[in-house]
Amino acid sequence: MKDVVDKCSTKGCAIDIGTVIDNDNCTSKFSRFFATREEAESFMTKLKELAAATSSADEGASVAYKIKDLEGQVELDAAFTFSCQAEMIIFELSLRSLA
């Protein structure tokens, strides 16, 4: 990896972060199945806490979710809308801590 960085820096390569993060998509969707409704609700509480910790204190994240009872399992569908795409990316990376 160091060789790539050295070659890139000697040739003057650069990337505009606006090319990567353009704020077109600020919503993260999440879906998971659980054995019980209580497990789904408990996990949703953790997701809300994570979204609150990730989002800016002024605006916060907009959260919409549904918990559906299906035969033998419960489905959690959630959407988290952040004020900017960077917050959404940080939130999605933070989901790894809940795995």
From Swiss-Prot:
One annotated Gene Ontology cellular component of this protein: cytosol
Top-rank lineage group of the source organism: Bacteria
Sections of the chain in a coiled coil: none
Pfam families given in the database record: DUF406 (PF04175)
Family per similarity comment: Belongs to the UPF0381 family.
UniProt xrefs under NCBIfam families: DUF406 family protein, PRK09981.1
Protein name: UPF0381 protein YiiS
Phylogenetic lineage: Bacteria, Pseudomonadati, Pseudomonadota, Gammaproteobacteria, Enterobacterales
